[in-house]
Amino acid sequence: MKKGIRGHDVREVGVKAISEKIKERGMGYIQLVIERSVAGFKPGGFSEELAESIKAELGDVKIAILGSYINPSAESEEARLGEIEKFKEKIRFARILEPLAVGTETGFFGPTQSDEANNTEEAYLRVLNTLRPIVAYAKEMGVNVAIEGVSIFVINSPRKLRRLIDDLGEDNVKAIFDPVNYVRANNTDKMDAIINETFELLSDRLVAIHAKDFAINPEGKLIYPDPALGELNYKLIFENMKKYSVDIPIILEGIPDDRAEASFDRLENIKSSI
C-alpha cells in the first residue's frame, strides 16, 4: 500500500521535519499545500530556488498531490483570472517538485451554496472554461492537473467529473477520489454505488485516494471518525482497486500523524482480507 498524509496534518514545523516524521510513521507520500507547510510563503512567492529547497527537504518522500485548491466557480471574471494565476504558480512549482498532480476542487456557483445553482449548465461551463487555460499551461510544463469531486460543489458526482475530464480532452487531466466528499446525511445508503461508479468511470484517471470515514450519530448527524472506524466500505474500495489494477497513494486527510499508523493498520487488515 502506498501510504501518505497531508503535510499540514503532521505536527511538525517545516518541510524537512514534516518529511522526517512521515517516514518515521511508515509513510512515503505527502499531499503538500505549500502555504500551510512552508513558513512565510504567500501566493506570488515562487522561485526556482525555493522549489529546489523544498524538494531537497522532502528527501525521498514523494508528493502525491501538490494542493492548489482554487475556486474555478468564482463569480467575477477578475476573481477567476486571479485563481488561474494562483494555480499556474503551483504548476511552476510542480515542474520541479514532480508531484503526481496539482489538485483542486471546483467550488460552488453563486454567492452561497445551492445544489440547484451548482447543477446548471452555466455553472458547469464556468468551471470548464476556467480550467481550460490551466490544463493547457500544465500540459506545456509536463504537469498533471487533478480534480476532486465534492457533493456541495459544481463537480459533485463521478459522472460529472468524467464529463469534465472528457470535455477538457487532455491526457494530463486526472482525478482525486475522496469518497467522504460525496457523503451527506441523506445519501449514506448510496455510497457503495458511488464507489463502484467512480472506479467504473474514472479508474484510468485516478491519481490518489483520500482516506477518512463517516458515521451517523444518534441525533442523525454526520460525524467523521478515523478511517475504518465508521461506515465507509473500504473493502469495496480495495476490491475495486484490485479489479481495475489501481495502485495509487492513499492519503490520510484530517488525521493527525500520531494516529496514522493505527489508521493504516486497519486499512491493511481490510485489504489483506480480499
Positions of PLM-derived features:
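Acidic/histidine-rich catalytic cores of soluble enzymes
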Residues: 30, 36, 66, 132-231
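Glycine-rich, proline-tolerant flexible connector loops at the mouths of alpha/beta enzymes
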Residues: 32-54, 106-113
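Active-site acidic/histidine proton-transfer and metal-coordination neighborhood
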Residues: 16-17, 52, 57-60, 75-175
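Conserved, mostly hydrophobic/aromatic
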Residues: 22, 30, 83, 94, ...
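Short, acidic/polar
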Residues: 11-22, 82-91, 188-199
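Short, well-ordered coil/turn segments that N-cap beta-strands
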Residues: 1-3, 26-28, 59-64, 97-100, ...
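Catalytic domains of carbohydrate-active enzymes, especially glycoside hydrolases
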Residues: 16-35, 97-98
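Boundary/entry segment of secreted carbohydrate-active catalytic domains
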Residues: 1-13
